[in-house]
Regions:
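Serine-hydrolase-like catalytic core of hydrolytic proteins
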Residues: 15-131
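Aromatic- and Gly/Pro-rich amphipathic surface segment
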Residues: 1-23
């Protein structure tokens, strides 16, 4: 951990790789307020990585706390299946797997559906979501 104000190299270069796992369907929500009666716009953020690598929490700069406070928005970041877990086409094995090549995209759709249903509990406006 950082031990002084001058020692920021760990903060800048630290990657939180966490534990890789196909059970990665999580999202993070930052909100500046819940019980103040406001309906805030929602920023729905999908990390980069070319659908092959990355996560919503791998860098400290990915945390949405400051953006939520300064922008008065609700920030949602998501994880989704990547690489083979997200895009392997298993449709040759039957109808059960006909959409398997789109798992990553379906994860994103499921996260957006969750936002539509639940974001009002975090002070967000489900009708005002920016991706």
């Amino acid at each position: 951990p950082t031990t002084s104000v001058q020692d920021e190299s760990e903060f800048v270069f630290h990657h939180d790789w966490g534990f890789t796992n196909e059970n990665c369907l999580v999202l993070n929500v930052w909100t500046p307020g819940i019980n103040d009666g406001k309906k805030r716009p929602v920023l729905f953020w999908i990390h980069g990585g070319g659908f092959a690598a990355g996560s919503s929490q791998e860098l400290p700069s990915y945390e949405g706390e400051n953006l939520a406070k300064k922008g008065d928005v609700v920030v949602v970041s998501i994880n989704h299946r990547l690489n083979v877990l997200g895009f392997l086409d298993l449709s040759a094995y039957g109808d059960k797997y006909k959409n398997s090549a789109n798992n990553s995209v379906l994860d994103m759709v499921a996260a957006l559906e969750w936002v539509k249903t639940n974001i009002s509990n975090f002070g967000g406006d489900a009708g005002n979501v920016t991706i």
